[in-house]
């Protein structure tokens, strides 16, 4: 049985750990509010952008812009994987990595090569241990990022697609549904898929709008930006999801600390009671021996 001092030291250690987890929970909560504010401010712009672009693309032939064209042969697939730079966020990073590897395995089974663009240290570290090539790794960028990061990633995959170094590009990100749900999402961003278009785009060109100078000219300007907007929205979602997952993980850790403290306190009391009982037995035994 552990000594009283050992049990007491464990209780003190666990209480200190709880102080850390509670502080991390509060920090994650504050960061989540900031990330939610960013994504809520960006969503109206993104939604209207998708609606307009979907309408334009539906009313135009795919040959008007190379980013709309499906390559005749799909030989190489690019996957943009977004994860966090830091851990302590439960199974969040593992879920993102597993979703990306699942898509990679599907494409490999079809005889296609797979290349990765990793945003976040955790994703890059995991993919390095696999057979897949990492074209670009963006480390320490998920902590503080802006649209410039999305533009940089977007430009690289666009250049690779136009040069036919990539034939399809997928984005894997954590879709922020709410504080309790952040499922991984895999979205095709190149070539532009019908899923990315708004409901207006799915039904064809909107005859109420007159586009100047031309649909083709607008698509040439908007399609590259569409890719960057998609990437940026994925980064925002992943950032929100990371903070929500870390907040939940730290809350669970704090609860576990409470349970362990309760268990160890009970053990401490039992150990102390046993020690007192043993001392009393020694005293009684000594007294009886003196009487005899």
Swiss-Prot record:
Protein name (database record): ATP synthase gamma chain
Lineage summary: Bacteria, Pseudomonadati, Thermodesulfobacteriota, Desulfovibrionia, Desulfovibrionales
Membrane topology: Peripheral membrane protein
Organism the protein comes from: Maridesulfovibrio salexigens (strain ATCC 14822 / DSM 2638 / NCIMB 8403 / VKM B-1763) (Desulfovibrio salexigens)
GO annotation, cellular component aspect: plasma membrane; proton-transporting ATP synthase complex
Family statement: Belongs to the ATPase gamma chain family.
Stored Pfam families: ATP-synt
Biological process, per Gene Ontology: proton motive force-driven plasma membrane ATP synthesis
Functional summary from the UniProt entry: Produces ATP from ADP in the presence of a proton gradient across the membrane. The gamma chain is believed to be important in regulating ATPase activity and the flow of protons through the CF(0) complex.
Entry keyword annotation includes Ion transport: yes
Record key words, sorted: ATP synthesis, Cell inner membrane, Cell membrane, CF(1), Hydrogen ion transport, Ion transport, Membrane, Transport
Molecular function via GO: ATP binding; proton-transporting ATP synthase activity, rotational mechanism
Subcellular location as annotated: Cell inner membrane
InterPro entries cross-referenced by the UniProt entry: ATP_synth_F1_ATPase_gsu, ATP_synth_F1_gsu
Subunit note: F-type ATPases have 2 components, CF(1) - the catalytic core - and CF(0) - the membrane proton channel. CF(1) has five subunits: alpha(3), beta(3), gamma(1), delta(1), epsilon(1). CF(0) has three main subunits: a, b and c.
HAMAP family recorded: ATP_synth_gamma_bact (MF_00815)
Statement: the UniProt record of this protein carries the keyword Ion transport: yes
Matches recorded under SUPFAM superfamilies: ATP synthase (F1-ATPase), gamma subunit
